[in-house]
């Protein structure tokens, strides 16, 4: 992906005042930028007049940068440089790719000449602000009889899902990054019995189960019938599947599908994934 385009249409004065924007709007915007930079996406395109986008009922982005309160609000002092960079070069309208004679629409609304239309023309991703009608992914853009689905992000980690769907991110990297910092950790997974066992036929089930674990609290995980979370028992037939140190931590498992299972141990509220079982080999003996 050559870059990301900021969606000026996602700013319509939705932030109540300067403090609301600096405290609630720009921090999420910054987290999305960090995701892009971590993947090596360095170009942040925007329309040339983006500085004039209406962020609050009475202030544009330029106003927010130059207002006296920008020197007082802690978040403003922290993020001013981020916003300043966001309203500067590169501008996509220096070299527009959209057809000037075509009509681009979203939900029957004309968006020709906007960053939404440009993202469709360039096949790149949009970055939108929160609290707007553009909190959805994908954004479907029509150009006559032609329809284009434009990836759209407005909070952290969404970019990785879009890159994965576009085939620009491997399954292993997507899962590792997507679920990092939460209840799942894949840093200890076995190379032979790990990601290499996930294919096109079962990957959605794995991702759905990981997402479920991430969303539920531990009390709900333990009692959820779908996950069937339980202790895996050590015996003469099962002991060789894990090291003595891993057994001492207490091996657990949860269900991916009727046959597939995920094994690991829990430490400080994090499930460290060790391996998968796709043929009930482990489940049948422990």
What residue spans do the PLM features occupy?
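An acidic, glycine-rich, mixed-charge low-complexity segment common to nucleic-acid enzymes
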Residues: 1-215, 221-225, 229
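Compact nucleic-acid interaction/catalytic patches
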Residues: 106, 270-286
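Active-site-proximal segments of catalytic enzyme domains
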Residues: 214-253
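Short, solvent-exposed loop/turn segments at secondary-structure junctions
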Residues: 259-261, 278-279
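Active-site beta-strand-loop-beta-strand hairpin of nuclease catalytic cores
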Residues: 260, 265-273
């Amino acid at each position: 992906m050559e870059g990301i385009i900021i969606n000026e249409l996602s700013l319509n004065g939705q932030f109540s005042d300067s403090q609301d924007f600096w405290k609630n709007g720009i921090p999420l915007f910054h987290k999305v930028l960090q995701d892009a930079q971590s993947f090596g996406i360095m170009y942040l395109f925007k329309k040339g007049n983006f500085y004039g986008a209406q962020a609050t009922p009475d202030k544009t982005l330029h106003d927010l940068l130059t207002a006296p309160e920008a020197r007082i609000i802690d978040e403003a002092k922290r993020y001013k440089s981020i916003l300043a960079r966001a309203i500067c070069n590169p501008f996509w309208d220096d070299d527009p790719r959209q057809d000037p004679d075509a009509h681009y629409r979203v939900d029957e609304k004309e968006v020709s000449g906007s960053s939404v239309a440009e993202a469709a023309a360039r096949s790149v991703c949009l970055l939108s602000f929160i609290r707007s009608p553009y909190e959805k992914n994908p954004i479907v853009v029509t150009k006559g009889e032609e329809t284009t689905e434009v990836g759209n992000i407005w909070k952290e980690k969404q970019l990785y899902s879009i890159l994965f769907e576009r085939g620009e991110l491997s399954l292993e990297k997507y899962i590792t990054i997507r679920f990092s910092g939460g209840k799942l950790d894949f840093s200890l997974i076995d190379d032979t019995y790990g990601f290499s066992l996930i294919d096109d036929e079962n990957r959605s089930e794995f991702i759905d189960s990981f997402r479920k674990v991430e969303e539920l609290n531990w009390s709900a995980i333990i009692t959820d019938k779908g996950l069937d979370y339980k202790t895996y028992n050590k015996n003469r037939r099962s002991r060789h599947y894990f090291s003595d140190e891993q057994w001492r931590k207490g091996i657990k498992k949860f269900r991916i599908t009727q046959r597939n299972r995920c094994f690991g141990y829990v430490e400080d509220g994090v499930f460290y994934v060790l391996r998968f079982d796709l043929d009930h080999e482990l489940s049948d003996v422990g």
